Amino acid sequence: MEKVKAKKHLGQHFLKDESIAKAIADTLSLKGYDEVLEIGPGMGVLTKYLLDKPVNTRVIEIDTESVEYLGVNYPKLKDKIISEDFLKYNINQVYENKQFAIIGNFPYNISSQIVFRTLEFRDQIPEFSGMFQKEVAERICEKKGSKTYGILSVLAQAFYDTEYLFTVSENVFIPPPKVKSGVMKMTRKEDYSLPCGEKLFFTVVKTAFQQRRKTLRNSLKTLNLSDKLREDIIFDKRPEQLSVEEFIVLTQKIEADGVQS
């Protein structure tokens, strides 16, 4: 079968550098799980290295042409190709009560959404590793005080330890993207339960960063906080000045004020 043609509307950029594919596969620790799901395998440059590992590898791919190519060229994937959109797929069809890692050279147009979906299933996903646009990979790992620190940074780091691993040139893709790429990894924290209401925590973080240049006193007005709470000095800060731990404290204060999630 001929090679798959990259489709712009799917954000496809096929990695052609074998050493980088192997390096991404090798970021997996293989600890605490024996199942791996690769998102957007394309023509399988990363898949071939995953299939050599002592884990049960499945792939999920929305592009029917890629699905056909994988079926022809990777017989080991027989019955392990999920022809679906990861963002809509019912993960528990395959992984109910199972721990599994996620890996991929992620489609750039949905990479942030892939992370948010991973957070939804964090009880089942101890490890997440892969390639993003460089700025997205950096944002996930960013610490407070940076202009790129935001919703994705705080929510990911609330449940996972994040690590930016290495930068990848535009020249190792077909077609080459317009920006550099970055590989990062998330490892679920040993204790990843929050000492505050999780739903309210998500609401506070998202609401705060929707008006990131304003102080929390102004950006969180819609939560109808009491005047007494709004006098707390934490509300003098802007959202990018708060660490993950400080967002948890902020949520606890808001909970104590009687605000429900």
From Swiss-Prot:
Q: Where does S-adenosyl-L-methionine bind?
A: 13, 15, 40, 61, 85, 105
Keywords of this protein's UniProt record, alphabetized?
Answer: Cytoplasm, Methyltransferase, RNA-binding, rRNA processing, S-adenosyl-L-methionine, Transferase
- SMART domains annotated for this entry? rADc
Q: Is DNA damage there in the keyword field? A: no
Please list the reactions this protein catalyses.
Answer: adenosine(1518)/adenosine(1519) in 16S rRNA + 4 S-adenosyl-L-methionine = N(6)-dimethyladenosine(1518)/N(6)-dimethyladenosine(1519) in 16S rRNA + 4 S-adenosyl-L-homocysteine + 4 H(+)
Location in or out of the cell: Cytoplasm
Q: What is its EC number?
A: 2.1.1.182
UniProt GO cellular component terms: cytosol
Matching entries from SUPFAM superfamilies are given as: S-adenosyl-L-methionine-dependent methyltransferases
Q: Name one GO molecular function term.
A: RNA binding
Give the matching Pfam families. Answer: RrnaAD
The function of this protein is:
Specifically dimethylates two adjacent adenosines (A1518 and A1519) in the loop of a conserved hairpin near the 3'-end of 16S rRNA in the 30S particle. May play a critical role in biogenesis of 30S subunits.
The entry's family comment says: Belongs to the class I-like SAM-binding methyltransferase superfamily. rRNA adenine N(6)-methyltransferase family. RsmA subfamily.
Protein name, UniProt field: Ribosomal RNA small subunit methyltransferase A
Origin organism is Flavobacterium johnsoniae (strain ATCC 17061 / DSM 2064 / JCM 8514 / BCRC 14874 / CCUG 350202 / NBRC 14942 / NCIMB 11054 / UW101)
Give the encoding gene's name.
rsmA
